[in-house]
From Swiss-Prot:
It is found in: Cell inner membrane. It is a multi-pass membrane protein. It comes from the Bacteria. This is Probable transporter PD_1892. The lineage of its organism: Bacteria, Pseudomonadati, Pseudomonadota, Gammaproteobacteria, Lysobacterales. The keyword Transmembrane helix applies. Belongs to the TsuA/YedE (TC 9.B.102) family. Keywords: Cell inner membrane, Cell membrane, Membrane, Transmembrane, Transmembrane helix, Transport. The chain crosses the membrane at residues 4-24, 45-65, 71-91, 114-134. It comes from Xylella fastidiosa (strain Temecula1 / ATCC 700964). Induction: Repressed by BigR.
Length: 135
């Protein structure tokens, strides 16, 4: 399989899982909301299977394609921790995450989600440029 098919397949699977979650569970696939409900003691039967799927998906990929994607992170642990906290803060400020706004919200033609996703992308590009990713 060509390396270009992996992101296409990933997008198809994201779309299918989003539609299935909505049709079978009546909920949208906003990861921050799902994890937030779990942390607040929400119904585990509705939320745990989705989170488990997020963990098992990459493992299943590795087994099926006999390939472990190589990922190199050049950042230090303090940078990673601060980045994670900033993402969490932005998720709360934006009332959702990239999956909720970018996948589900845009598909629903939500103006709030379109604006939030544009801000995510612009912020990501600015941060990557500032951090010297594009040299």
């Amino acid at each position: 399989m060509s390396e270009y098919w992996y992101p296409i397949l990933g997008g198809i699977l994201l779309g299918l899982s989003t539609v299935m979650l909505l049709l079978l569970n009546g909920r949208i696939a906003g990861i921050s909301g799902i994890v937030g409900r779990l942390l607040q003691g929400g119904n585990p039967a509705q939320n745990i299977p989705f989170v488990v799927g997020l963990v098992l998906g990459p493992l299943l990929f590795t087994v099926i394609f006999d390939r472990f994607p190589s990922v190199t992170v050049a950042a230090t642990w303090p940078t990673i921790i601060v980045a994670g906290l900033l993402v969490g803060l932005g998720t709360r400020m934006g009332a959702g995450c990239t999956s909720g706004h970018g996948i589900v919200g845009i598909a629903r033609h939500s103006p709030r989600s379109i604006v939030a996703t544009a801000i995510f992308l612009i912020s990501g590009m600015a941060t990557a440029t500032f951090m010297g990713v594009y040299q």
